[in-house]
Amino acid sequence: MKTSPRRPLILKRRRLPLPVQNAPSETSEEEPKRSPAQQESNQAEASKEVAESNSCKFPAGIKIINHPTMPNTQVVAIPNNANIHSIITALTAKGKESGSSGPNKFILISCGGAPTQPPGLRPQTQTSYDAKRTEVTLETLGPKPAARDVNLPRPPGALCEQKRETCADGEAAGCTINNSLSNIQWLRKMSSDGLGSRSIKQEMEEKENCHLEQRQVKVEEPSRPSASWQNSVSERPPYSYMAMIQFAINSTERKRMTLKDIYTWIEDHFPYFKHIAKPGWKNSIRHNLSLHDMFVRETSANGKVSFWTIHPSANRYLTLDQVFKPLDPGSPQLPEHLESQQKRPNPELRRNMTIKTELPLGARRKMKPLLPRVSSYLVPIQFPVNQSLVLQPSVKVPLPLAASLMSSELARHSKRVRIAPKVLLAEEGIAPLSSAGPGKEEKLLFGEGFSPLLPVQTIKEEEIQPGEEMPHLARPIKVESPPLEEWPSPAPSFKEESSHSWEDSSQSPTPRPKKSYSGLRSPTRCVSEMLVIQHRERRERSRSRRKQHLLPPCVDEPELLFSEGPSTSRWAAELPFPADSSDPASQLSYSQEVGGPFKTPIKETLPISSTPSKSVLPRTPESWRLTPPAKVGGLDFSPVQTSQGASDPLPDPLGLMDLSTTPLQSAPPLESPQRLLSSEPLDLISVPFGNSSPSDIDVPKPGSPEPQVSGLAANRSLTEGLVLDTMNDSLSKILLDISFPGLDEDPLGPDNINWSQFIPELQ
């Protein structure tokens, strides 16, 4: 702690006379330098003073000489056995007799065979006796000032005791004064100005020292228990101000004390507050006295003095001796030892406690960021969706309600990524959701003639787990269907084909240059494909949900036309690109409204490639133009009512047949898988014209039972596709990216299928 700025000055003032200890030796060195004339004059003056001293009834052996430099000042040499009080009385009387003209200052020095007092201090004091001041300056060589002897009547035994405590260096310096007056010539080195100013200052200091010594004499005995505090002045006592005030008040007999006495008691018992503490500790004492109710202020009878007492109900009569009382009564331990033991470790304990309390707090501050990591609910895990909740809407709940249920289920299980439920359309003939705009449609792989088999396939789809892929028997394919006049657009179909080929090459473990869609599989092949799909679906589930690929905004996505046949590019190149009669943005917004409330991009659009990965087989476009659109059996299966002017100039590249015809009649003979692949555009692209509107599903026209059956299957597959898409945020990508290894090398290819077993059912 910082020391008080004024305290070192007080200490210096007390030690100020100490450097004068070498004064006798210095004077002895200077004595030979004195001129003989000065010595003779001093001797003459001294002889006069001796005569005066005899007349003033001075005791024998006292020599008085005038000061060589200071006017009206005399030096009095006192023997060891002289009575100081009688000498002072005689000097006072002499000063009164001489008045202002005579000497009124006397410097007393001790003389004899041995130094009466150690060298060091030359304090001077001045005392007033009358209207005329007679200053008696007593100069000694001991640490005890002569002013104390003037102001405090002490017995000669005390003075002798002080004289016996002199240091031996005075003797070595030869400070013994002979009877010859020449031995006091060392006083010449003092100038009158310096000696006068020093005498005035030292007189004031000696008064202060006198009062301090009187106070120390009074409190010398009670301060004995706290003697050990002298060894630890730099350490603050381990007591509060309130406790120290109680110690001070309870130390008195009447249990009351003035504020000044409280200050004094604390300074005496705890030197820290006297030497080191800042002066503000007294303000703290006053603050505690007025703050605590246990301290009561009382006034004396005359109302001039106020005392502080402790309220009887709150007084525990704590004293400093009780605090330092030994714990073991059998061990007589001094209070000061206990005091030092109790005082010294406490600051260390306090520091240790602060360290112990601060370190856990710092550790807790560091651990705060780690706390959320421990919480298990923040770890991304795969939430298993209840199968009943997923499958029930596909069978019992209407489509809008199913969409709302799935969106709420998705929002509840995956809060980070929200993907709008999209309608997945299986490879069956269905009707669009509404006739107002193009929706997501389904396609027949081999024409409407296979519609009697579709209910069985739909049942198989419902048996599949909701998070799994559907097998090739009824693979759902998302297709954004444009209006009728936009259907033969060459560029979107080219993009669709290239995008699918990019998916196949990037996602499938084995590259497959061909895609063969066969709606009929043997039971063993269906089971094996289901196992493969389940295995891939589990592997996709095991991936982190954070691995999501950002898609471009939906505005930038082109309209997709479904055509995966290898001859589509050549077929589309021969067709003129018609004017687009519908806004792609409206179609996208419509598809988002159908899917759900979230505006998310369509996920089946992928980066396109300018080079198709499938070989284009030579095929004449004339085989596709078999019948014009006017021959479609009188049934309007167009999802959008378009103007006739937009649909008239379109040629018929799709080979639309009557509904009563079968794919075997319209398609060329299947000699090889290549021929089957090249005939895919016939089967797949003819589906949009075979899709019926909701009115056609509810009230089918006579002579066309197939659209009704396919429409029922489409309703079921629509909801099924919704369930599959809302299961996981990555399933919609799996539906397009899933690969089918072993498809090309299957011995049971499309050309090995016996189509005759299906002919009776189709008829």
UniProtKB/Swiss-Prot annotation:
Phosphothreonine: residues bearing it: 611, 620, 627, 662
Source superkingdom? Eukaryota
Post-translational changes noted in the entry: Phosphorylated in M (mitotic) phase. Phosphorylation by the checkpoint kinase CHEK2 in response to DNA damage increases the FOXM1 protein stability probably stimulating the transcription of genes involved in DNA repair. Phosphorylated by CDK1 in late S and G2 phases, creating docking sites for the POLO box domains of PLK1. Subsequently, PLK1 binds and phosphorylates FOXM1, leading to activation of transcriptional activity and subsequent enhanced expression of key mitotic regulators. Phosphorylated by GSK3B leading to ubiquitination and proteasomal degradation.
* Coiled-coil parts of chain: none
Task: Tell me what the record says results from residue 693 to A.
Answer: Prevents phosphorylation by CDK1 and subsequent binding of POLO box domains of PLK1
Q: Where is the composition biased (Polar residues)?
A: 36-45, 583-592
- Provide one Gene Ontology cellular component: chromatin
Q: Where is the composition biased (Basic and acidic residues)?
A: 200-223, 336-351, 494-503
* Cross-link entry Glycyl lysine isopeptide (Lys-Gly) (interchain with G-Cter in SUMO2), positions: 163, 201, 325, 356, 422, 440
What tissue specificity does the UniProt entry give? Expressed in thymus, testis, small intestine, colon followed by ovary. Appears to be expressed only in adult organs containing proliferating/cycling cells or in response to growth factors. Also expressed in epithelial cell lines derived from tumors. Not expressed in resting cells. Isoform 2 is highly expressed in testis.
Q: Which residue stretches belong to region Disordered?
A: 1-53, 198-232, 329-351, 482-711
Q: Outcome of mutating residue 611 to A, per the record?
A: Prevents phosphorylation by CDK1 and subsequent binding of POLO box domains of PLK1
Under Gene Ontology molecular function, one entry of this record is: DNA-binding transcription factor activity
Record PTM Phosphoserine, positions in chain: 331, 376, 489, 522, 693, 730, 739
Task: Please list the residue ranges the record marks as binding DNA.
Answer: 235-327
Q: Specify the inducers.
A: Induced during liver regeneration and oxidative stress.
Q: Where in the cell is it found?
A: Nucleus
Sorted alphabetically, the Gene Ontology BP terms of this entry are: DNA damage response, signal transduction by p53 class mediator; DNA repair; G2/M transition of mitotic cell cycle; negative regulation of DNA-templated transcription; negative regulation of stress-activated MAPK cascade; negative regulation of transcription by RNA polymerase II; positive regulation of cell population proliferation; positive regulation of DNA-templated transcription
Q: Which Gene3D superfamilies match?
A: Winged helix-like DNA-binding domain superfamily/Winged helix DNA-binding domain
Q: Keywords of this protein's UniProt record, alphabetized?
A: Activator, Cell cycle, DNA damage, DNA repair, DNA-binding, Isopeptide bond, Nucleus, Phosphoprotein, Transcription, Transcription regulation, Ubl conjugation
Q: How does it assemble?
A: Interacts with PINT87aa which is encoded by the circular form of the long non-coding RNA LINC-PINT; the interaction inhibits FOXM1-mediated transcription of PHB2.
Q: What is known of its domains?
A: Within the protein there is a domain which acts as a transcriptional activator. Insertion of a splicing sequence within it inactivates this transcriptional activity, as it is the case for isoform 4.
Q: What's the name of the protein?
A: Forkhead box protein M1
Q: Which organism's genome codes for this protein?
A: Homo sapiens
